[in-house]
Design a protein with these regions (language model features):
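Extracytoplasmic
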Residues: 1-153
């Protein structure tokens, strides 16, 4: 994992792995992974928005997909992208992502109980550049680049 200064929406971005590395099975423990702790006050659904740099597939079988699954009671994985685009250069979604300089993807997770949890971002397609993660527990207002970052140390 490499922090790339000035590439993120609000500062540095994370490059998860080497973009020229071969495809990997995302469930493998060897894939690039970033984890973020968060606290949920209630059980229920949470929408996870990932903002990633829009990129073209480097290999024909590459699809920028991460599976969405619950790893344990408190660890969750999300899908970074919606999959391969047959012709990304002519896709409306691709066009909007390039104009915004990020592709915004949404996954919905179910939180079983209140408390501390961990969001795990794992990639089977190394090289994805993660710019921002937003957790919406309900009531988030729509905006072009999402809400401002909240950092609690």
């Amino acid at each position: 994992i490499t922090a790339v200064e000035g590439l993120g929406i609000e500062g540095p971005a994370l490059q998860l792995g080497d973009p020229t590395a071969p495809l990997q099975i995302f469930r493998s423990r060897d894939v690039p992974c970033a984890e973020y702790d968060f606290y949920a006050f209630d059980a229920g659904s949470v929408d996870v928005y990932t903002y990633v740099l829009p990129t073209f597939p480097l290999h024909a079988d590459r699809d920028f997909r991460i599976g969405e699954n619950t790893n344990t009671d408190t660890k969750y994985s999300v899908q970074i992208d919606d999959g391969a685009l047959a012709t990304p250069s002519s896709s409306h979604v691709w066009f909007e992502s390039v104009l915004r300089n990020c592709a915004v993807n949404k996954s919905t997770l179910h939180i079983d109980k209140p408390g501390r949890h961990t969001l795990r971002i794992r990639v089977g397609d190394p090289g994805i550049v993660l710019q921002k993660i937003v957790l919406d527990f309900g009531g988030m207002k729509r905006s072009y680049l999402g809400p401002q970052s909240t950092l609690i140390e």
